A protein has these predicted regions:
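Cross-family detector of peptidyl-prolyl cis-trans isomerase
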Residues: 1-124
């Protein structure tokens, strides 16, 4: 996995079974303002399927970061971003219950464990 916070990360395909709990790994620890559960965050991120390694979303691919209120995001982000500091890069592995729900929940990614690499660029 690449660790530069200025470039799109590359995620190596994981081995073994997908975790059943949220996994949080700090790749780079930031030294700026800390995200809170009530924050709006400015992030660059990459999302891939745990099972296939296929990319399903990336702000880098769109060419610009995005602002999100954490309260509007999947539970994996709501639980995995607070405590992160601006300038940091964090990997979240979100089981279905903390992503888009069990298979058949009506979202194309339901039933899947998802991996996100997130660069925190700002918080409000």
């Amino acid at each position: 996995m690449t660790t530069s916070n200025n470039t799109k990360p590359e995620i190596d395909a994981p081995e073994g079974p997908a975790p059943s709990e949220l996994e949080i790994v700090d790749i780079t620890v930031g030294d700026g303002d800390e995200a809170q559960a009530s924050s709006t965050v400015n992030v660059h991120y990459l999302g891939v399927s745990y099972d296939t390694g296929a990319e399903f979303d990336s702000s880098w691919s769109r060419g610009e970061p995005i602002n999100f209120p954490l309260s509007n995001l999947i539970r994996g982000w709501q639980e995995g971003i607070p405590g992160m500091k601006v300038g940091g890069r964090r990997k979240l592995i979100c089981p279905p219950a903390l992503a888009y729900g069990p298979a058949g929940s009506g979202h194309p990614l339901s039933g899947q464990t998802l991996i996100f690499v997130i660069d925190l660029l700002g918080v409000k």
